[in-house]
From Swiss-Prot:
The keyword Lyase applies. GO terms for cellular component: cytosol. InterPro entries: Dihydro-acid_dehy_C (IPR042096), DihydroxyA_deHydtase (IPR004404), DiOHA_6PGluconate_deHydtase_CS (IPR020558), ILV_EDD_C (IPR056740), ILV_EDD_N (IPR000581), IlvD/EDD_N (IPR037237). Keywords: 2Fe-2S, Amino-acid biosynthesis, Branched-chain amino acid biosynthesis, Iron, Iron-sulfur, Lyase, Magnesium, Metal-binding. The gene is ilvD. Mg(2+) binds at residues 78, 120-121, 442. Binds 1 [2Fe-2S] cluster per subunit. This cluster acts as a Lewis acid cofactor. The keyword Iron-sulfur applies. Its cofactor is [2Fe-2S] cluster; Mg(2+). The modification N6-carboxylysine is found at residue 121. It is an enzyme of class 4 (lyase). This is Dihydroxy-acid dehydratase. Its EC number is 4.2.1.9.
Amino acid sequence: MRSDIVKKGFEKAPQRSLFKAMGYTDEEIRRPLIAVVNSWNEVVPGHIHLDKIAEAVKAGIRLAGATPMEFNVIGVCDGIAMGHIGMKYSLITRELIADSIEAMVMAHQFDGMVLIPNCDKIVPGMLMAAARVNIPSILISGGPMLAGRVDNKVCDLNSVFEAVGAYSAGKITDEELFALEENACPGCGSCSGMFTANTMNCLSEVLGMALPGNGTIPAVMAARIRLAKMAGMKIVELVERDIKPSDILTIEAFENALTVDMALGGSTNTILHLPAIANELGIKLNLDIINDISDKTPNLCKLSPAGHYHIEDLYFAGGVQAVMNELSKKGLIHLDLLTVTGKSVGENIKDAKVKDYNVIRPIDNPYSETGGLVIVRGNLAPDGAVVKKSAVPPKLMRHRGPARVFESGEEVFEAILKGKIQKGDVIVIRYEGPKGGPGMREMLSPTSALAGVGLIEDVALITDGRFSGATRGACFGHVSPEAAERGPIAAVQDGDIISIDIENKTLTLEVPEEEIKRRLESLGPFEPKVKKGYLYRYSKLVRSASTGAILE
């Protein structure tokens, strides 16, 4: 076995001595050594309970006859990091997580690993590591938070963000804001809507890297603990059969993930993460593939922020496997792909049934005939931008309005709360891209403020940054090339007319090309905002959002 290099033979006596210093017996050392990669911490509500998940995983590993060895990686809470310098450090942890797992697994030569993430960047970071080191691996998440309730109405973290805008506009009282603060997040788990964390946890199931149920079983349910034990047992089988991520993560698996993403109306951040994971295996997911899949995939779900349902509702309606089964009725799912169950996708989903067609629409009666995400292009975004079409108000599907230009999320947040944004405006937030930020911050605070003050159906927002999965409205992110690379977004001036046409997938700055070129040439080279530390190194290495913001 792979771990023999650190334990077998007389010359490995020093290594065995170190294992024995931790209390491992000869029998435990002889067995397959399984890394349990945990992201537990006391900072993130989605991770506060992962110690319990890890204990269940380790119990499963021991039941199956192998030896678990746990180590930890970092995890950032995007919600706590939102709206300040801390958000610059969110996306960049994806690479730190992948790199640190690579280092630990290669240094200690584990036979397999179980990955325990839950929140936004931790899931893709761990999947990138699995693809990179390519040893038998399985992912088991912590599970979604339950939705909150105030006055018998469901709510979630996004409700609190939007309430800040409503409070500043005098639309709600101190008591109403406090009630949301107290009740929107009722306990552990990844925030309860189809936000980035839950989207990625659902897609890990679709990719075949997690067991059925991983994306939707609530964090507080005993079924989550049972699933963790099953994952611990399953990794030993994967090691015995030598089933690696490269056997599972094929181009067809990524096509399945994109298809389900479109059906669920998932987070726009998947357009960063799926290409980055694929890149680790030498698979290129370009933006044209994404649009091709979106064009033929019906949108079957409207979960928060696009609708009032939450992940627990999706779970009780049949979960991700039921969505896949529904999509397979029109031949939209590759069925013969291998998964960590040891069975094919088709075998996994054949008995999955939709239990509530209000939550999961039937394939012949979708919310729309095309997917929830769309890539748009035009002279403002030559290399593309992404919008969550399923969360855009109908009257903003096509829009033309004057640009209001800002250099940071904080500037526009303040302008919204002070009433400086008018109906019809097109907000442009630039120098928030991977290099320009650096770190490509999420713009949830500005979009939530727009919703709170009542402008979310009348104002569009365009940025080279990105959006939280909780964002709703006509919000275009990942504009590429970014302003720091002197993309056309750097040339926009206040009052320029911007045209949006989501159905035709265009984003147009109504300024002559010669004038755009003249403006860009007058800017000179971009001066980095950060001159030291990890952010500085990241800004030097990161590529465009159109590539998944990977490092090179």
